[in-house]
Amino acid sequence: IKNGLVMFNKFTTAGLSFPVQGSAAFNGTSDFIDVATLPLSDFTNFTYSGWAYFNTASYQNIFGFGNTTNSTPVSLIEIQSGARINFFHRDASSQSVGVLSPAVNLNQWYFITATKEGTSHKLYIDGSISNTGSGSVPNPTFNTCSIGALNRVSLTNYFNGNLANVAIWNRALSSDEINSVMWKPVQALSATESNGLQAWYSLDDIASPTASLASMEQLATDK
């Protein structure tokens, strides 16, 4: 955990209109969460998802994997200049698949989901398919995982906004599952929905931000 994040309450934060108790605010310059234990080791099939609120539009990492000795391999969800969401997966030999959304609005909450199933890559915005891509990317080697910044040879692309319910599965969720999961806390997931869940970072502990931040690297064993 770096540079203690601010926890926001949905009843006092303007514009908050999504189904969790709060969120973590990232300042765009130094805040990020270093996930010490990588939640994935096999990148054949997976799902990344989470609620995101963007204050600005530039290259900002929502969630992703990197390598501190080689900047080429990455697997991430980010917002780019032009306010487009990008799901990008690349190995050390630069074989990659990128899936871009149309421009989104700033100062608005979105539920963003990226799925990979074999060579099929899909990007969902608020439960609806935004764009797809296809390609073979050999299993990359990563040694970092972070929320709110891209951690590779150097730390870059700090996130400016709020995040909540960032989650990782070792399988590709279906469209129906995504539309169900987006409205639930981890405790409400069905047995089917929690199948393959590797980690869930609520980022919403209002009563005890310190306790919440200290426990965010744990796997979602309470699902």
Predicted regions and their residues:
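A general structural motif at alpha-helix termini
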Residues: 182-185
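Extracellular glycan-associated modules
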Residues: 1-173, 188-216, 221
